[in-house]
């Protein structure tokens, strides 16, 4: 469906001086700014979207609450699909799963391709022992007006498929059980969660996944899972540190991953924003002059730097 930004038709925003700005799609910003190049990815939430003559909506969307407080939003809704087919397709390892992603990516109506690596499935088996024992990777798919006969011909026999709302929701719960278990594990072990939100150009997705796996192995980090939005070359690496040494190694490795993603033309934040803990990554993706252009917009709308201090930019005097 594309980014959230393009589905926003209007906003009411309270600015830091107490004024209220009401804008609709097509209302242009009242200042000129240089264009900041975007990463060559389907998603990017790192920094502000800036380009000459841009809409106010495009500036506020994804700004992490650093420019104003959105109190009302008008959204464009799409018709609910009459029929959605869902499935969990299991593979023996990553390679056939990645081949399937390449083969299926442009299937009409395919709206979701989610990836689980072997370690993700091992963690999920604690709650879902029905996962085939030989499965070393999996894809969760959803297709509008799907053809079950097609999937019967192209998916391994032990895959799961459902067309009912109830079963489809069960598959969604299966997907969301993984980050829940990751968070539970992290809490029990007493370390902060170490995770990525990186995306790379689709053509580099396989390369990036292999890079993750090789570097984790070389650094002797065994407690991790890799899962997420493989259709967008946007996978999450979660390191579940079990010692101080593993935590410190994981921190260094996540920074290395971010640098490599940018080298491949990717982004340091695909969907979740930088917040405070990842604000330091902004300088990996943008030049000092580009970041200064973003800060100039921040100073214009929040001259005292009071909104969401430390989000996106490390704490800075006005």
Residue ranges: model-predicted function:
Residues 267-274, 309-312:
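Short acidic/histidine-rich active-site segments
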Residues 238-245, 277, 281-285:
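Conserved PLP-binding active-site segment of the aspartate aminotransferase-like
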Residues 1-107:
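FAD-binding subdomain of flavoenzyme oxidoreductases
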